[in-house]
């Protein structure tokens, strides 16, 4: 239902059909400002929006000719609906209940009435104009960005120097703050680095603070293990991280009191140490957050080891020698442990540069020149043993890098034998 704020404006939530005859109503926050002679509607309460965020729609009160309850013929399937006739356009709005509908219709009709001021009210009008000029002068005061921290249980505001690193002069006007904030909402690929776990869901929501109970818009990101919220989408470091293992329950907040009464699409994340109150932009978004968080918590409880293994693969840097270092890791899973250990211990760079030990021949000793073929193995039989004979289990096989033992006869075969094979020479 509508209420009057500190600036004597009528405020509240309504559903508006922005495109006539579309049948789609969107939730908006309306402000009826009789002093500014206009009706404004925002995406949310301006206190929750970013600095400099303007209204998504406006309507001058002088253009309103009539405000009445919509007939069943106009909107048969929309209860508590009323219509604003302004110039040649009609605005259909939907209230929460019958009392809300009646209050809004009376307030809009009262504000759109054309009144002729009396002669005795001219000085009063001048005073009103002066009082209106005073807040406008105060609003022109430059706003300073600050960072809120809790040090020793005390809230400390630290001013932030926004000129640092931008190449701007100190004497430039302070309008760059709004420009920087508008640039910060340019969509990007995400707030996480390329090595982080993939995001399940992300988006902006309004969160209640723990100390001052203030509501601020934050960028939430949900992955397989945590719920993080950032000041904006481009931030790398989160303001806080909620581990899914600590989440006890996530559901829609139905029991409201105090400041929570005016909060729609509100759900709570209950942990062992704190309850987080989060407001989504729409009921669909709220139910989507509740569903995704609940599914992630359930998946973490059912398969904690598989989730941790998948995260270790995603966090491994490319080119590393771990199991997830390359495409060969999939082939190594089916090997024996000994073979896998050999593959990991022997680096490719060392294998290409490894050279066998070459002995220095003794004086007066001749080495038999041999031709290496593709069939030569790494280990060769000792001198004096035939290549065709079977190798005894107790005999030691000589490595090609081991020097040959000196023998009396330099040649094993008789070169004058006619039955000798050419391959034995």
UniProtKB/Swiss-Prot annotation:
UniProt region (Disordered), positions on chain: 374-410
Cross-referenced SUPFAM superfamilies: PH domain-like (SSF50729)
Gene3D superfamilies named in the record: Pleckstrin-homology domain (PH domain)/Phosphotyrosine-binding domain (PTB)
Keyword ATP-binding included in the entry's annotation: no
This protein's record includes keyword Repeat: yes
Record-annotated membrane-spanning stretches: none
Annotated crosslink Glycyl lysine isopeptide (Lys-Gly) (interchain with G-Cter in SUMO2) location: 141
Record Pfam families: PH (PF00169)
Subunit and partners: Binds MPDZ and PTPN13.
Protein name: Pleckstrin homology domain-containing family A member 2
GO annotation, cellular component aspect: cytoplasm; nucleus; plasma membrane; protein-containing complex
GO MF annotations, alphabetized: fibronectin binding; laminin binding; PDZ domain binding; phosphatidylinositol-3,4-bisphosphate binding; phospholipid binding
Gene responsible for this protein: PLEKHA2
PANTHER family: PLECKSTRIN HOMOLOGY DOMAIN-CONTAINING FAMILY A MEMBER 2, TANDEM PH DOMAIN CONTAINING PROTEIN
């Amino acid at each position: 239902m509508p209420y009057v704020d500190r600036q004597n404006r009528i405020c509240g939530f309504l559903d508006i059909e922005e495109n006539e005859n579309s049948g789609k109503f969107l939730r908006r926050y309306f402000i009826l400002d009789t002093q500014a002679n206009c009706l404004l509607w925002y995406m949310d309460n301006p206190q929750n929006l970013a600095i400099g965020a303007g209204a998504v729609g406006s309507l001058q009160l002088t253009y309103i000719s009539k405000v009445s309850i919509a007939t069943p013929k106009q909107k048969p399937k929309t209860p508590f609906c009323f219509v604003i006739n302004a110039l040649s356009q009609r605005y259909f709005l939907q209230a929460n209940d019958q009392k809300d509908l009646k209050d809004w219709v009376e307030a809009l009709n009262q504000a759109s009435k054309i009144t002729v001021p009396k002669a005795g009210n001219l000085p009063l009008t001048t005073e009103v104009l002066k009082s209106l000029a005073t807040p406008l002068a105060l609003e022109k005061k430059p706003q300073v960005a600050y960072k809120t921290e809790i040090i020793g249980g005390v809230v400390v505001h630290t001013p932030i120097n926004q000129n640092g690193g931008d190449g701007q002069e100190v004497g430039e006007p302070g309008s760059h703050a709004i420009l920087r904030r508008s640039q910060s909402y340019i969509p990007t690929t995400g707030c996480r680095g390329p090595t982080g776990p993939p995001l399940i869901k992300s988006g902006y929501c309004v969160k209640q603070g723990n100390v001052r109970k203030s509501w601020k818009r934050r960028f939430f990101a949900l992955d397989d293990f945590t719920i993080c919220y950032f000041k904006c989408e481009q931030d790398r470091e989160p303001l806080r991280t909620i581990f899914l293992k600590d989440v006890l329950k996530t559901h829609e907040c139905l029991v409201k009191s105090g400041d929570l009464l005016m909060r729609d699409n509100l759900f709570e994340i209950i942990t062992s140490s704190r309850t987080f109150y989060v407001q989504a932009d729409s009921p669909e978004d709220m139910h989507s957050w509740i569903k995704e968080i609940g599914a992630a918590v359930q998946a973490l409880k059912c398969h904690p080891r598989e989730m941790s293994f998948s995260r270790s693969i995603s966090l491994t840097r490319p080119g590393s020698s771990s199991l997830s270092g390359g495409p060969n890791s999939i082939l190594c899973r089916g090997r024996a442990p000994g073979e896998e250990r050999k593959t990991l211990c022997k680096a490719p760079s060392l294998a290409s540069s490894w050279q066998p030990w070459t002995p220095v021949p003794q004086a007066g000793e001749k080495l038999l020149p041999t031709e290496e073929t593709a069939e030569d193995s790494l280990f060769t039989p000792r001198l004096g043993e035939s290549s065709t004979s079977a190798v005894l289990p107790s005999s030691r096989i000589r490595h090609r890098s081991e020097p040959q033992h000196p023998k009396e006869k330099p040649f094993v075969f008789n070169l004058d034998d006619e039955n000798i094979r050419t391959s034995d020479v």
